[in-house]
């Protein structure tokens, strides 16, 4: 069996490609809108589809990966992810484009769960740092791709190229990963019956709103050269702080790290109200991007690593709620009240997430593990 560092590296590479569905949208959406004559709300549909489908696919794919191992599930998911980009490039209209994007999003979601939980299962002793390093790829991949997409200027050429590269890289790589044996944990059924799971769920759904609002709608708030700069910088920022905040979670505990990330994310959103767009994007990118790994770290500590791909996949579905709030709802508030109202909405969501966590007692206490069979 390869050394566990190999699995960490494989998870990182998979994450680099996973980020392309989320963090290229600020550049692809205006191109698609111009080519197909779509408005702001119609452009937001693609991002909403991605968030909902990718998150809903995770629990089912995660359960299969926990049961049968990640190889076959990962390879099939890699094919779907690649075909999503290729289908988007070839689609003659928005309906088929949305269909292709949805199928690809399902593959991306399952791959995300496998990549993240390679770190969870192999690095219980350095959980925060390891998951942070793997998740660094979720920003870095798009930071490399976005300038290339902007230089091409044609969404069909860009998405076709991405899809072909994914077929060549992700499919063989997915066949080379595996999970360790002999882990303990709490089954998804027991996790769902624990009130703390739903506390984490509601809090994450709200806490993700600032990050996902900028991921889907940054082009509504800034324009021109600043948009290209920030759209390229944003995913890099999203990944950059994940190892640092993950290491802090190992030292302080994940709950304290979550509070810090939510507070700075809310402050960054409010900074944009004062016209400090670059400061705000940096603050939200650095801390908002780390929020998901901190919630999944806390979930893994409570419920254990054995069923982590499924349990974390269930928790990750809260991103579908957050994505709907951060794309469709954010766009609706923007249409009604402009940038100021929509940014206030995003900041209030992060503050509400903190309040939900504070109301739950004994949040960090591990749940007794299922008996080994």
Swiss-Prot record:
It holds the Pfam family MFS_1. CDD domains: MFS_OFA_like (cd17353). One of its GO terms (molecular function) is transmembrane transporter activity. One of its GO terms (cellular component) is membrane. NCBIfam families: 2A0111. No homology was detected between this sequence and those flanking other archaebacterial rRNA operons. This is Uncharacterized 38 kDa protein in 23S RNA operon.
